[in-house]
Amino acid sequence: MDLRGTRITVHDMTLRDGMHPKRHLMTLEQMKTIAQGLDQAGIPLIEVTHGDGLGGSSVNYGFPAHTDEEYLGAVIPLMKQAKVSALLLPGIGTVDHLKMAHELGVNTIRVATHCTEADVSEQHISYARKLGMDTVGFLMMAHMNSPEGLVQQAKLMESYGANCIYVTDSAGHLLPDTVKARISAVRDALKPETELGFHGHHNLAMGVANSIAAIEAGATRIDAAAAGLGAGAGNTPMEVLIAVCDLMGIETGVDVFKIQDVAEDLVVPIMDFPIRIDRDALTLGYAGVYGSFLLFAKRAEKKYGVPAREILVEMGRRGMVGGQEDMIEDTAITLAKASAAA
C-alpha cells in the first residue's frame, strides 16, 4: 500500500509507559530534560504521569518519586510546541485528578479501560469533553476482544464524547494481520471525524510492523517511546518508527536524527536495565499478558523461587488483566506450594 503523503500524529510514551521499567522513580530533572528533547525533535504530543495513570501512586502499582502534579507542573511550562497528555484509568484516577490535570494545562486526556469494559469510562470521558479537552478512549489488551467486540466498545466511548479511540496492544501479542482486522473494523464503524489510534508493545518485535499495519488500516495517531522505554520489552521504538515512516513517505513532522539523539543520549543512560526482548518479556507477548506485570513477576521470582516465566504463563492462562498486579504474588505462592508438594 502506498502511504506517501499520509499524515500521522506520533504520541510519545517515554515519560508515562517508561515509568514502568523505572519503577515510577524518574526524577523531575530527567522528565524535564527528556521532554525538552522530544519537544525540540518535533514530537507533537507527550504523555506524562505515573505509569498506571493519574492517581496511580499506591502500594499495588508503586509509589513514584514525585506526584503527578509535580511532574506535570515541571514539564508543561517548558514545552515550546508539544502538547502534554495524561492517562487515566477509571477506578485508579478520579474526576478530581482530571480537573487537576486540566488546570495544570494538560491538553489530552486518555481514559483507559479493559477492552470489554468501556462502560466504566462514561463519567470521565463526558466530563473531559465538557472541559473542552482532546478526549481519547483507550481500549487496553485489545487481543482479548474480537474485532466485532471492539467495535461495540469503541462506539460506546464515542457516544460518551471521545473524539479519538485507541486500539491498545498492552501485551504486545497482536500481529500485523490481527491489528489490521481490529483497526479496519473500528474505523468502518466510527464517525469519519472520530480519530483512531494504535498503541503497540515490542514483546514479539512487532511494534513498528504493527504500527505501519495500523496506519494502513486507518489509524492516524500512533504511540511510541524513545529507545522503546516502556513496560515489557518496551513500546514501539520511536526513533525506528520515525525512520521507517520517513522511508515510506508517511509525514510525522519529527526530525529523524534529533529523535535518535534523544533516544541514545537522554533515554538509554537513565535505563535501570536494557529494554530488550528477554525470555520473560517474550513470554508476555506469547502468552498475551499485560506488559507492566514483568517487573512484578521478576520480583516474585526472587521472593518465592518460581521462575517469572512460569508465573506469567499462569497469569495468561487465568486471563488476568491490567490492574490485577496483586494477583502476581498470589499466583507465585500457589505455584510455589504446588512445586513443593510435587
From Swiss-Prot:
Catalytic activity line of the entry: (S)-4-hydroxy-2-oxopentanoate = acetaldehyde + pyruvate
Record-linked PROSITE patterns: PYR_CT
Gene3D superfamilies reported for this sequence: 1.10.8.60, Aldolase class I
Residues the record marks as active site: H20
Top class in the EC scheme: lyase
Domain (Pyruvate carboxyltransferase): residue spans on this chain: 8-260
Site (Transition state stabilizer): R16
Name of this protein: 4-hydroxy-2-oxovalerate aldolase 2
Classification of source organism: Bacteria, Pseudomonadati, Pseudomonadota, Betaproteobacteria, Rhodocyclales
Gene name, Swiss-Prot/TrEMBL: mhpE
